[in-house]
Structure formats: C-alpha cells, structure tokens
Amino acid sequence: MMRTNYCGQLNSSHVGQEVTLCGWVNRRRDLGGLIFIDMRDREGLVQVFFDPDRQDAFKLASELRNEFCIQLTGVVRARPESQINKDMATGEVEIFANALTIVNRSEALPLDSNQTNTEEARLKFRYLDLRRPEMAQRLKTRARITSFVRRFMDDHGFMDIETPMLTKATPEGARDYLVPSRVHKGKFYALPQSPQLFKQLLMMSGFDRYYQIVKCFRDEDLRADRQPEFTQIDVETSFMTAPQVREVMEQLVRELWLDVKGVDLGDFPVMTFAEAMRRFGSDKPDLRNPLELVDVADLLKDIEFKVFSGPANDAKGRVAAIRVPGGSQLSRKQIDEYGKFIEIYGAKGLAYIKVNERAKGLEGVQSPVAKFLSEDVLSALLDRTAAQDGDILFFGADSAKVVTDALGALRLKLGRDLNLTKNNSWEPLWVVDFPMFEEDGEGGLSAMHHPFTAPRDMLPSELAANPVSAIANAYDMVINGYEVGGGSVRIHSGEMQQTVFRILGITEQEQREKFGFLLDALKYGTPPHAGLAFGLDRLVMLLTGTDNIRDVIAFPKTTAAACLMTEAPSFANPASLEELAIAVVVKGKAAQDGKSENE
C-alpha cells in the first residue's frame, strides 16, 4: 500500500497509529541534531520528526530538500502542550518517522515560495504553482461545487446529456474557434460558444429537464473574469415559466452557498434592467455599495450653465448626481483624478458640490458651478440627494449612455477607494426585463442576449412593427456585481423566430444556411421552454474569494489567449496543413514551413 492516510487529515484521534504517507517536502529544519520536515499533500501539512536513533531514516532525511517527493512510515504521536501549533489543522500531532523513501528528487524550483511570483512565471510552471496550498484548495472547492451541482440537478429530475463539441458556426455574439475538416476539404467545424441550440433541440425531443457541465469557447477580448475556453453549468427546461426557472436556480445557488460558505443568502430581490441602470449605472449592480445615481435633470433645466441645462432639456440626455457621504474631505487632486477616470467612458468633465454647512445655503457649499445655482435650486438638489454636511455631490451631464456608464463606473471606484463597499457581505439579485434589441452602431439592431430569446407579451406582427420597444423575457443572476448566470424563455414559434431573424438583418437565404435545422425543428410541436447557464468559473471565483478567474482554472490561458506552459497556440506541421488543404497567409503572403515571415 503506497499510503494509508493523507497528511492534512491526521489529528489526535490517530495518536498511536502507524501511518504511511506520500507527498512532498514543504520545509526542512535541522534543530540541534534533530531533523523536522513539514510534509505536504493535497489535504495539507503535517510535521514529521526524524530521530538519530533511526539511523537509516535519519541519514536519508539529511538529504531532503524542498519539493522532494517522498514516502514515509511512522507513528502518530501527540505534540507536547507547549509545541502545539494552532495555525495548522494537524498542529496537535506529529509523525515519528521509522522509514523513509525518496521517491524523486527535485531541482531548485523556478518559483519562490517565500515571495510573490509574477503571473507569467506561475502560468509557465503551472504544475508547480498548483502545489501551493491556496491553489490546491481552490481546485478542491471547484470539485466540491461541481459534485454539489450534479447531486442537486439529479435530485430535481434533470438529465445530464452531452452535446457536440464539433458543430456549425452560428452567430452568437463572439468570434468562433474554427476547426478544419480533413474529410470535407475547405469546410470547418466551430467549437461551441454554448450548447444553446442543441439544448433547445433536446427540449423539442422531449427531454424536459436537461443539464450539462460543459466547456464553451469564445474568441473574444479577454479580461480578468474571462477565458477563451470556460465552463458553463448549462440548464434547459420545458413547460416551466421564467419565475419557475428562477425559483429552481435560486434554490440551487442558495443551497450551494450554504454548503460551501455556511451562508444563507435569503430570497433574491428582483430588479428591472431599467431600474438597475437608473440607480446604479449597471445591469449587474453591486448592491454592497451604498452609492446610487439620482436623476436631477428636472431641477437644472432653466439654469444658465449650458453643461447642465443642455442635456437636461435633451430627450436623449441625462443629468444625474452621486452623493458620497463624508466626501467633502476629498482633495482637489483626488477630484481631478476622478474626472480623468470618467473620461474613459466619454465624459467631458466631473462637476461637484462640497457640502460644508448645508444650513448656510450657497455660502455653505464649495463648487465651481455654485455661481450658476439659485438658493432654491441648490436646496432642491440637496433635498433630492439627501446631502448632509461633509458630503460631496458628483454630477454627470451628457447623453444618457455616457452619464450612465461614467457615473456607474465612478460609483464602483468610489466604493472601493473610500471603503464604502461591504466586502464581507453577499448581495444577490435577479435583473429582468432587458431590452430585446440594442443599436449595433451601424444603423441596425443586435440581440441584447441572443436571437433565440422570446419577447414578453408580443405577437410576431407587433414585434416587427416596433422592435425597439420589445422587452426580452430574460433574466440574469447577479452576485456582488458579477453576472454569474443568465437565461431566458426561448422562442418556440417558427414565425416568431423568423421575425427576429429579419429584424436582425438575417436574410431568408442566411436563415436557411445557418439555422435551417432549427427552423425545421420548430415545425414539429415545439414545447415552450426556458433555461439558464451559470459561469462555473465565476461561481468558483466568488466562492474562493479571488478576483481573477485564472486562479480557479487548473490550466488557464493568458489575456492574450496563450498557454505559457505548453506554448499553445503553435504553428501547424506543414504536412498537416497540406492534408487539410490549408495555406497559412501572414501579412498577405503564404507562410513557408508553417512559420511567419517575421520569424
């Protein structure tokens, strides 16, 4: 038997037992002729003691260095009271070693366990980075989460059904990863951005409760919470309304948080998209942050300051304020930095009012715009925003989109910078009633979610006549400012589906080429169906307390979609390209021998 126990699971109940352990040397210490090591495996650490009287084991122990892979046999014994280490789970015991085997020696590690390593180094030597207890713990938590999800879904009558990885390219919002076909030369498969259409087809097939923990692929610009390949908890149901789907999925998440964190999230509030954007400047509001956007355009329509009155009198404009409690202490330099920050979102400046003594009216405030305000207007602003002495008001005045985006981002930054966000709390909610379409910047419309989302309470003819007013029967689950899941009621009418395609500018010919199989399936008694997909990686990220999705994926990609460890992507073998009838072109020239002209 290679091992009888895991290092990190030993405790006082094992005292007197002989155990065999396998793992790595985490640290070695020579203390006055005695040798101690901390031995590590996936479950944690335990202290091992080598006595000179056990000559063979002691001699071999003198050769040990960090990260040697070893096996040892010894007796568990209680530590003296004075030597108990309360910072270790195994701190009440130690192993008195009788026998030691060095399974494999280790060279000096390229990662330093005593300092912070660069992310580049951690990704290049990921197999070593994963030995760190905090990384191992995150992957253990991930495994615990997926096991919990499977049990929950099985208990609620959902069937785990796999869908294809090699499929057809369909427009779902991001670029596809393409896979060339050797058999069908000149043709390509696409790796799925989601199992969306296949799970809808499963509903049409009669499998009324489906789930799958599945890899998805999107060739898009990356950031801290995105990866080119990611994992979804994918769910679809038939004969369930949107509130019923939300109820089951909310139960899943509430029970998951209780299991992993011991936290009862309580009932999730439901907020419309319009309210979220109006109050928080985001469709995924972080409710731990108490700051809100307050509309004040009606109070500023008639003032002589055109920066305010212009947008206030424009149907497409917005003037809003954020009250920051205690913010009057901010320096001019800090305020200027916030002004530069919102320029990222198209804002042209950041007006402010410092409220020093509210009772004194205009004499009690400090502001470059105060000279444009009457006592009545100032009083109305302070009442509307509930401003108190010591507060500061920040204003945004521009198009509705610029103001909403800029103040929404400023709200989050202020919450972080001024420690207003309650970092140790959980604030989940549902966001519903999204617009079905949004302008695409080229005079057309694009689907805000995806083109298979059903509208709320509209006939195809009504949708075609006024698509801009359509509200999607969609819902997102948001926790602490992260969208952890999103779903919708799906279109189950061929007429409605084709109406949506036409609104999106997809011609009849394109509809047949790209979605003919779906349109055909919709002819044969399609049930009403709805679903949702959770981002597993984001859930694990939240539950393990990290803000980087790469910390919860065993072998992630960089923000440039590269694997530093395997050096993927790589150039293809020329023989393979020839077999696939593919010529690689770089800067307009065919690459020779699978290499670019710049190599």
Curated annotation (Swiss-Prot):
It is found in: Cytoplasm. It catalyses: tRNA(Asp) + L-aspartate + ATP = L-aspartyl-tRNA(Asp) + AMP + diphosphate. It comes from the Bacteria. GO terms for molecular function: aspartate-tRNA ligase activity; ATP binding; nucleic acid binding. Keywords: Aminoacyl-tRNA synthetase, ATP-binding, Cytoplasm, Ligase, Nucleotide-binding, Protein biosynthesis. One of its GO terms (biological process) is aspartyl-tRNA aminoacylation. InterPro entries: Aa-tRNA-synt_II, aa-tRNA-synth_II, aa-tRNA-synth_II/BPL/LPL, Asp-tRNA-ligase_1, Asp-tRNA-ligase_1_N, Asp/Asn-tRNA-synth_IIb, AspRS_core, GAD-like_sf. Residues 196-199 are annotated as: Aspartate. ATP binds at residues 218-220, 227, 483, 535-538. PROSITE patterns: AA_TRNA_LIGASE_II. Pfam families: GAD (PF02938), tRNA-synt_2 (PF00152), tRNA_anti-codon (PF01336). Its main location: cytoplasm. GO terms for cellular component: cytoplasm. L-aspartate binds at residues 172, 218, 449, 490. It is an enzyme of class 6 (ligase). Gene3D superfamilies: Bira Bifunctional Protein, Domain 2, GAD-like domain, Nucleic acid-binding proteins. SUPFAM superfamilies: Class II aaRS and biotin synthetases (SSF55681), GAD domain-like (SSF55261), Nucleic acid-binding proteins (SSF50249). Its EC number is 6.1.1.12. Catalyzes the attachment of L-aspartate to tRNA(Asp) in a two-step reaction: L-aspartate is first activated by ATP to form Asp-AMP and then transferred to the acceptor end of tRNA(Asp). Belongs to the class-II aminoacyl-tRNA synthetase family. Type 1 subfamily. Homodimer. This is Aspartate--tRNA ligase. It comes from Pectobacterium atrosepticum (strain SCRI 1043 / ATCC BAA-672) (Erwinia carotovora subsp. atroseptica). The lineage of its organism: Bacteria, Pseudomonadati, Pseudomonadota, Gammaproteobacteria, Enterobacterales. The gene is aspS.
